[in-house]
From Swiss-Prot:
Function: Plays an essential role in viral DNA replication by acting as the polymerase processivity factor together with protein OPG116. Serves as a bridge which links the DNA polymerase OPG071 and the uracil DNA glycosylase.
Organism per entry: Vaccinia virus (strain Copenhagen)
The name this protein goes by in its record: DNA polymerase processivity factor component OPG148
Highest taxon above the source species: Viruses
Gene name for this UniProt entry: OPG148
UniProt keywords, alphabetically: DNA replication, Phosphoprotein
């Protein structure tokens, strides 16, 4: 029988296999180790180890330099490397997250702008973007024929956010140390946090990356959320001294297995610290971590893509959309609106609150039932006041994991439907 840990490994192997074309060396190494594990465990798994892939970003970036070094004379372009989730937009014309291989939906105007940039130069291999706090910025543009600066200028004309950059001529051998690093970093005077610096020498394609940092451990006092947009909240990790550790998104929080009132490993930069996610940080399974973090954040929030959103009015909007009636701000307005339509009223009467709420959110029925069968509910006055997942192994199914991460919203809609039924028919 396949164990929970085996299923997690196989799921990660499949995800990495799908994203090999956009993998860096660390992801390829992880993929090969999982292929080796899978072959020894199951004899034949249908995929093979790889040495090279058609488009690996490691082809364009040298190994990171984390100690002072001498930089040769020449003309250079320096670029910031931003903190956040890294995405690649290529000739396939879709935004793919580096490492996970997950496709990401972007606004139509952004997609159109990216396509125009790609179509302007047949030599562009890909555009590199960073997503942080629900904001996109182009970080790099890889072209065989021209400097990224030219592509940045064009991208800016099409409305894309572009990085600050610095063009310098270095006339003699120069020590690239912490002082020079800080001077260059300060010249990038935008608000995005920068984790390192990359540079390109004129006439060369490969980027050199400089990252001066120190590892440290910090005590976590609390895990909260910060508002970054219209009902969009990003996880926030607070230390005992009140300092904030930077977190990319919900998945970053999960991978790091961060827990309140424990120490976590961080990368310390000059002005901020970054939550460091690495294998071996505790023995919890992914499902156990997801359950704990959702419990920590509380029942007022649900996972919405990479971030959290607050339950409430969003559920009412989805319910009115499902019923094809006018939007309502309160349950009273919803009841009045339903009373205007005999068809809608009959639908509410004949369909269970359970099924209507599930359909409203578009959950697959079989996966939803599997999740519910692994949960225990506390019901008062026909409403769900609390729930607990008793077996997190079912979260190894990605679809079930997504439903569970969103389950607080289901409960909110279910309770609204229950309230509406009571007012209409009792």
């Amino acid at each position: 029988m396949t164990s929970s840990a085996d299923l997690t490994n196989l799921k990660e192997l499949l995800s990495l296999y799908k994203s090999l074309r956009f993998s860096d060396s660390a992801a390829i190494e992880k993929y090969n180790s999982l292929v080796e594990w899978g072959t020894s465990t199951y004899w034949k798994i249908g995929v093979q180890k790889v040495a090279n892939v058609e488009t690996s970003i490691s082809d364009y970036y040298d190994e990171v330099k984390n100690k002072p070094f001498n930089i040769d004379p020449g003309y250079y372009i320096f670029l910031p490397v931003y903190f956040g989730s890294v995405f690649i937009y290529s000739k396939g014309k879709n935004m793919v997250e580096l490492g996970s291989g997950n496709s990401f939906q972007i606004p139509d105007d952004m997609r159109s702008a990216c396509n125009k940039v790609l179509d302007s130069d047949n030599g562009i291999d890909f555009l590199r973007f960073v997503l942080l706090n629900n904001r996109w910025i182009m970080e790099d543009a890889i072209s065989k024929y021209q400097s990224p600066v030219n592509i940045f200028k064009l991208a800016s004309e099409y409305g894309l956010n572009i990085p600050k950059y610095l063009e310098i001529e270095i006339e003699e051998d120069t020590l690239f140390d912490d002082e020079l690093y800080s001077i260059i970093e300060r010249s990038f005077d935008d608000k995005f946090p920068k984790i390192s610096i990359s540079y390109i020498k004129l006439g060369e394609l490969r980027r050199q990356v400089v990252d001066f940092f120190k590892f440290s451990f910090m005590y976590i006092e609390s895990i909260k959320v910060d508002r970054i947009g219209d009902n969009i909240f990003i996880p926030s990790v607070i230390t005992k001294s009140g300092k904030k550790i930077l977190v990319k998104d919900v998945d970053h929080l999960i991978r790091s297995k961060v827990r309140e009132h424990t120490f976590v490993k961080v990368k310390k930069k000059n002005t901020f610290s970054i939550l460091y996610d690495y294998d071996g940080n505790g023995t919890e399974t992914r499902g156990e971590v997801i359950k704990r973090i959702i419990d920590t954040i509380g029942r007022d929030y649900y996972v919405n893509g990479k971030y959290f959103s607050k339950v409430g009015s969003a559920g009412l909007k989805q319910l009115t959309n499902k019923l094809d009636i006018n939007e309502c701000a309160t349950v009273d307005e919803l009841v009045d609106e339903i009373n205007k339509s005999g068809t809608v009223k009959r639908k509410i009467k004949n369909q269970s609150a359970f099924d209507l709420s599930r359909e409203c959110l578009g959950y697959p029925e079989a996966d939803f039932i599997t999740l519910v069968n692994n949960m225990r509910f506390k019901i008062e006055n026909c409403k769900v006041v609390n729930f607990n997942i008793e077996n997190t192994n079912c979260l190894n199914n990605p679809s079930i994991e997504t439903i569970y991460r969103n389950f607080n919203q289901f409960v909110s809609i279910f309770n609204v439907v229950t309230d509406v039924k009571k007012r209409l028919f009792e």
